[in-house]
């Protein structure tokens, strides 16, 4: 879809696949990715309705393990906020949630418009401090069933992709790891097209640009197909040179 957006010309995914396959550029995956989730029973229909939060572990050579706290919008898959922590406490969760509310402007809206929070049953997520903070913010807290990680499939999958990418290189300082995480989040939010989002980026969906982009892509596709038909008709309308010479003789 980036080719369509940048070159203003439509090429189907099937055509791209055939070309890559012919050049032996389609490789088998190094591992089979297991789906992290089925479908959430109460699906979101717009951004800022439900936020998923979770921790994951990342190692810094010579420093030990650090904890990455992430807040992800359920509908758009947009990473709203993240924070690298040396601990995994309730205060680390709220320290990530605070900028998530501010960045979206949700700290200024009425309570009934606040997003719900979906988390697992980790110690930091069932702590009384977090419950008090959520109550003060007017946010509803939903916790997944124990030993049922697929409830948070989107954020679990995002963390796994991040670790697969980042663990290819060692980080020797917290600042270096933060730079890697920042680059990954920037790529996933603003550059990577998600098939589940109609080949839009998370930012396109989160900030409401998706419908306009899809409409423009549809227009480009119609224009491209019309041009191809005209070119085909023009080519078939011209007599073959050998046949033309035979007719003249």
Which residue stretches match the model-derived regions?
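Basic, flexible linker segments flanking DNA-binding modules
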Residues: 1-50, 148-149, 206-210, 215, ...
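C-terminal domain-tail junction helix/linker
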Residues: 128, 135-139, 160-249
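Mobile genetic element proteins and their domesticated derivatives, centered on retroelements
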Residues: 16, 54, 71, 77, ...
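An active-site-proximal beta-strand-loop segment
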Residues: 52-80, 86
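RNase H-like polynucleotidyl transferase catalytic core
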Residues: 30, 114-121, 135-154, 168-174
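Acidic/histidine-rich, metal-coordinating catalytic segments
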Residues: 97, 108-126, 145-147, 198-203
């Amino acid at each position: 879809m980036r080719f369509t957006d940048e070159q203003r010309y439509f090429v189907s995914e099937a055509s791209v696949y055939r070309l890559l396959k012919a050049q032996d550029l389609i490789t088998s995956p190094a591992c089979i990715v297991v789906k992290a989730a089925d479908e959430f029973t109460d699906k979101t229909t717009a951004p800022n309705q439900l936020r998923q939060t979770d921790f994951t572990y990342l190692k810094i050579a010579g420093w030990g393990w650090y904890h990455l706290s992430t807040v992800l919008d359920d509908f758009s898959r947009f990473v709203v906020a993240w924070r690298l922590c040396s601990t995994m406490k309730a205060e680390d969760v709220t320290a990530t949630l605070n900028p998530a509310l501010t960045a979206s402007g949700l700290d200024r809206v009425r309570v009934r418009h606040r997003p719900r929070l979906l988390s697992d049953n980790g110690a930091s997520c069932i702590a009384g401090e977090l419950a008090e903070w959520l109550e003060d913010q007017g946010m509803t807290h939903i916790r997944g069933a124990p030993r049922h990680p697929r409830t948070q499939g989107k954020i679990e999958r995002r963390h796994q992709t991040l670790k697969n990418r980042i663990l290819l290189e060692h980080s020797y300082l917290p600042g270096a790891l933060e730079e890697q995480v920042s680059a990954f989040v920037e790529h996933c939010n603003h550059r990577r097209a998600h098939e589940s989002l109609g080949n839009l980026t998370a930012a396109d969906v989160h900030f409401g640009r998706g419908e306009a982009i899809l409409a423009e892509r549809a227009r480009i596709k119609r224009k491209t197909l019309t041009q191809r038909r005209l070119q085909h008709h023009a080519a078939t309308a011209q007599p073959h040179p050998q046949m033309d010479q035979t007719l003249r003789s």
